């Protein structure tokens, strides 16, 4: 039994002006895709699948990750979620899904979401009571999440149709996503 990480990093970042995966993370020492990969690895996820799309050819090497290029990335996050879930090995019991534009999510939040995960587990991190990332999908939920994942809403249609365990993460992470360069500049991550 293992818990994998799934990093969704395929979007063009239209509001951001470039693929967010290739943007500098707060602090400037690494790109957002590298920060998020490190967060999943340090959070105990193994293996980690990174789904790239827009700008994939410009991405740096991502040691410790299986990179999947989603050629359908213009259709939205749903196709990236499906591509990532399809790439996971059979022995994986659950997967922690993280978005590349949430650099305030910490390895501690990943560990909290992933604790004692089973194939039946379905969890979402909350910040001030609102759902965010990471999200944990036990293997029993992959088919349903894949079927309902359309456009840029990812697994949300599936999550709202299920009983989801909410896991408060306010004390160890910042769940805000970055949509524009000023968001990054103003980030506390």
Where are these regions (language model features)?
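Conserved alpha/beta core of the MobA/IspD/sugar-nucleotide pyrophosphorylase nucleotidyltransferase superfamily
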Residues: 1, 147-189
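Nucleotide and nucleotide-moiety/phosphate-recognizing core
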Residues: 2-131, 139, 163-169
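A short acidic, helix-capping loop that chelates divalent metal ions and anchors anionic groups
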Residues: 15-18, 144-145, 175
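Hydrophobic, well-ordered secondary-structure segments
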Residues: 86, 141, 145-146, 153
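A residue-level structural signature of the nucleotidyltransferase/glycosyltransferase Rossmann-like core
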Residues: 102, 133-136, 147, 175-176
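Conserved nucleotide-sugar donor-binding
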Residues: 132-144, 181
């Amino acid at each position: 039994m293992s818990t994998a990480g799934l990093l969704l990093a395929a979007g063009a970042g239209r509001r951001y002006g470039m693929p967010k995966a290739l943007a500098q993370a707060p602090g400037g020492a690494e790109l957002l895709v590298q920060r998020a990969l490190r967060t999943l690895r340090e959070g105990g996820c193994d293996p980690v699948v990174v789904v790239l799309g827009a700008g994939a050819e410009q991405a740096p090497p991502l040691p410790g990750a299986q990179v999947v290029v989603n050629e359908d990335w213009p259709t939205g996050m749903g196709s990236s979620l499906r591509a990532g879930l399809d790439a996971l090995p059979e022995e994986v019991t659950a997967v922690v899904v993280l978005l590349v534009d949430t650099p305030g999510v910490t390895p501690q939040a990943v560990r909290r979401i992933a604790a004692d995960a089973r194939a039946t587990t379905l969890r979402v991190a909350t910040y001030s009571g609102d759902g965010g990332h990471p999200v944990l999908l036990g293997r029993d939920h992959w088919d349903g999440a894949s079927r309902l994942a359309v456009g840029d809403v990812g697994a949300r249609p599936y999550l709202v149709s299920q009983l989801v365990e909410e896991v408060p993460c306010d004390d160890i992470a910042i769940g805000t996503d970055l949509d524009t360069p000023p968001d990054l500049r103003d980030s506390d991550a």
